[in-house]
């Protein structure tokens, strides 16, 4: 079915503003995730053992560095190279497909983190849950390798779904008054099918994430009821760990839903309506979500907080030394 599409031009001011916001989001996202990566990788360099959660955070930060890089490349494509009055170029197709795969890996890693929190914090007398928690703690490395394998399988299937369909273009110009014309790219439908397939592939990890997060919420409720009965002191390490874990998981859920909605909305904006401003807004929202969750992860992780404190103290002492040096030089003069 052919669709009448109105191609709207984007002013230089809008493109410049979007590019500035994209650079800012890329800088914040790159710095926060690179910080998580470097803190944990430094322990690997020093041959210190990494905990299971640190291993997952290390992999999660790598996947998000790729996400931010791809979204920044998408922003550059939108502002400088891709004209929506023309068919989507191959490089923009490749960026979108790579983003879908990186986003898939990001979801699997967040699910792995949720299962790990669940296995560590849930207190249960059921034998099955105890065995499952022990299995998750012991098999975390195998789970990470499985995530890499799933991402590779998703890559192959998305590429097959994209290239297995016939590629041809139908472009019919009806009239050119007010830059209105009939423009339909059958080739872009293949991108939509790949996008839909990739998100259907995301249903199993998302359900696992919801189940493990729900179990953690139930466990927190039971723990708080137990504390109300037996003690009045709410400064319990287990309670604080529950709350920090839930804060991380709930924030990821919110950011993932917002990012997924923006991604779904961007598809018809890009393929059907050719609305570049709408696509820019969606890309900006998608780039902000991983940065927000990375900041929450840093605030909820003791090792990362200590690293932030150390860096701030070092920066403060360096500024103080420079100020004292300038004051001494002025006194001598």
Swiss-Prot record:
Pfam families: TAS2R (PF05296). Its main location: membrane. Residues 39-55, 116-142, 212-251, 298-333 are cytoplasmic. It is found in: Membrane. Keywords: G-protein coupled receptor, Glycoprotein, Membrane, Receptor, Sensory transduction, Taste, Transducer, Transmembrane, Transmembrane helix. GO terms for molecular function: bitter taste receptor activity; G protein-coupled receptor activity. Most taste cells may be activated by a limited number of bitter compounds; individual taste cells can discriminate among bitter stimuli. Receptor that may play a role in the perception of bitterness and is gustducin-linked. May play a role in sensing the chemical composition of the gastrointestinal content. The activity of this receptor may stimulate alpha gustducin, mediate PLC-beta-2 activation and lead to the gating of TRPM5. This is Taste receptor type 2 member 38. It comes from Hylobates klossii (Kloss's gibbon). The gene is TAS2R38.
């Amino acid at each position: 079915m052919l669709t009448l599409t109105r191609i709207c031009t984007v002013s230089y001011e809008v493109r410049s503003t979007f590019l500035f916001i994209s650079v800012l989001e890329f800088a914040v996202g790159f710095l926060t995730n690179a910080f998580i990566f470097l803190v944990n990788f430094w322990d690997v360099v020093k041959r210190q053992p990494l905990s299971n959660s640190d291993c997952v955070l290390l992999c999660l930060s790598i996947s998000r560095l790729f996400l931010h890089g791809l979204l920044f490349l998408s922003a550059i494509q939108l502002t400088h190279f891709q004209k929506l009055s023309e068919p989507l170029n191959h490089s923009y197709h490749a960026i979108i497909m790579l983003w879908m795969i990186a986003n898939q890996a990001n979801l699997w890693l967040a699910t792995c983190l949720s299962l790990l929190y669940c296995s560590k914090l849930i207190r249960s007398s059921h034998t099955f849950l105890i065995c499952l928690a022990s299995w998750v703690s012991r098999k975390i490395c195998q789970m990470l390798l499985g995530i890499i394998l799933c991402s590779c399988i998703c890559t192959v299937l998305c590429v097959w779904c994209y290239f297995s369909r016939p590629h041809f273009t139908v472009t019919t110009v009806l009239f050119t008054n007010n830059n209105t014309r009939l423009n339909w790219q059958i080739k872009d439908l293949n991108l939509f099918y790949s996008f839909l397939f990739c998100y259907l592939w995301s249903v199993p990890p998302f359900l696992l994430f919801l189940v493990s997060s729900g179990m953690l919420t139930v466990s927190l409720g039971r723990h708080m009821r137990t504390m109300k009965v037996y003690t009045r002191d709410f400064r319990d390490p287990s309670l604080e760990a529950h709350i920090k874990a839930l804060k991380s998981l709930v924030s990821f859920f919110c950011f993932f839903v917002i990012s997924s909605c923006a991604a779904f909305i961007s598809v018809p904006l890009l393929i059907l309506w050719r609305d570049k401003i709408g696509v820019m807004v969606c890309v900006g929202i998608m780039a902000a979500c991983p940065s927000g969750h990375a900041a929450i992860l840093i605030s909820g992780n003791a090792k990362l907080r200590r690293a932030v404190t150390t860096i701030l103290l070092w920066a403060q002492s360096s500024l103080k030394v420079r100020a004292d040096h300038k004051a001494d030089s002025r006194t001598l003069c």
